[in-house]
Amino acid sequence: GVACRCDSDGPTVRGDSLSGTLWLTGGCPSGWHNCRGSGPFIGYCCKK
């Protein structure tokens, strides 16, 4: 999948680790949670 930035990854600055996985539809898979808060963001940033 495509990596995305979780809220816990820090501000969007070059060199940040992207610990989430992008899911476009249907929310996060079972056993995962959305690790990204509100904001202009397409899909869900999910993390185990």
From Swiss-Prot:
Keywords: Disulfide bond, Ion channel impairing toxin, Nematocyst, Neurotoxin, Secreted, Toxin, Voltage-gated sodium channel impairing toxin. It is found in: Secreted; Nematocyst. It comes from the Eukaryota. GO terms for cellular component: extracellular region; nematocyst. One of its GO terms (molecular function) is sodium channel regulator activity. One of its GO terms (biological process) is regulation of signal transduction. The keyword Disulfide bond applies. InterPro entries: Anenome_toxin, Myo_ane_neurotoxin_sf. Gene3D superfamilies: Anthopleurin-A. Disulfide bonds join C4-C45, C6-C35, C28-C46. Binds to the sodium channels Nav1.1/SCN1A (EC(50)=165 nM), Nav1.5/SCN5A (EC(50)=103 nM) and Nav1.6/SCN8A (EC(50)=133 nM), thereby delaying their inactivation. Also inhibits Nav1.2/SCN2A, Nav1.3/SCN3A, and Nav1.4/SCN4A, but to a lesser extent. Inhibits Nav1.5 differently from isoforms Nav1.1 and Nav1.6. In Nav1.5 the effect consists in a right-shift of inactivation; whereas in both Nav1.1 and Nav1.6 the effect consists in an incomplete inactivation. vDoes not show activity on Nav1.7/SCN9A. Belongs to the sea anemone sodium channel inhibitory toxin family. Type I subfamily. This is Delta-actitoxin-Bcg1b. It comes from Bunodosoma cangicum.
